Regions:
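Hydrophobic h-region of N-terminal signal peptides that target proteins for export
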Residues: 8-17
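Low-complexity, intrinsically disordered terminal/linker segments enriched in charged
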Residues: 92-96, 106-109, 127-144
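Stable alpha-helical elements in mature extracytoplasmic
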Residues: 21-26, 47, 51, 55
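Short, aromatic-enriched amphipathic alpha-helices that serve as compact interaction elements
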Residues: 20-38
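Sec-dependent signal peptide recognition
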Residues: 1-7
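Surface-exposed patches in mature extracellular/periplasmic domains of secreted proteins
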Residues: 37-47
């Protein structure tokens, strides 16, 4: 009886938000760039729900702010047809983990480094670096 009650109570507790590993965080970002259902092929949404799920508090408001971007930073292009995505941990340094991501987008090789932190909600993105820019700088530059 006590076990059944404990299982029932555990079932009523909301599941913890966030991602359990840096790799799962990055995989879930790129799930929005697939070629399946329309809600999963339009890129990462620019709404508060997606911002809260994927980004640290300092980056959330920049992600949802109105702006005119020449391309989607996460795929380095205004359109996409992604090939296989390679995800690997570059290094763990204090509270940050650096995750390398490489893929082919319409015949062009793309490499990005995700800087992720493990916060109270799980793993979230603190910044993303391309060879020429960072997501924070990109969003600030193209803000309205």
């Amino acid at each position: 009886m006590k076990i059944a009650l404990a299982l029932f109570l555990l079932g009523t507790v909301p599941a913890a938000a966030g991602f359990k590993s840096p790799e799962s965080l990055v995989r879930n970002v790129y799930a929005y760039y697939g070629s399946g259902a329309s809600e999963l092929s339009n890129g990462l949404p620019r709404d508060a729900e997606a911002a809260g799920k994927f980004f640290d508090p300092a980056l959330r408001s920049a992600w949802v702010a109105p702006r005119h971007e020449p391309y989607d930073f996460l795929v380095q292009s205004s359109s996409w047809r992604l090939g296989a995505i390679s995800i690997s941990i570059l290094r763990r340094q204090f509270d940050k983990t650096y995750v390398a991501v490489a893929f082919d987008n319409q015949g062009r090789a793309v490499t990005l480094n995700f800087i992720v932190v493990n916060g109270p909600e799980g793993w979230v993105i603190a910044d993303i670096e391309s060879p020429h820019d960072s997501l924070r700088m990109f969003l600030a530059q193209h803000r309205n």
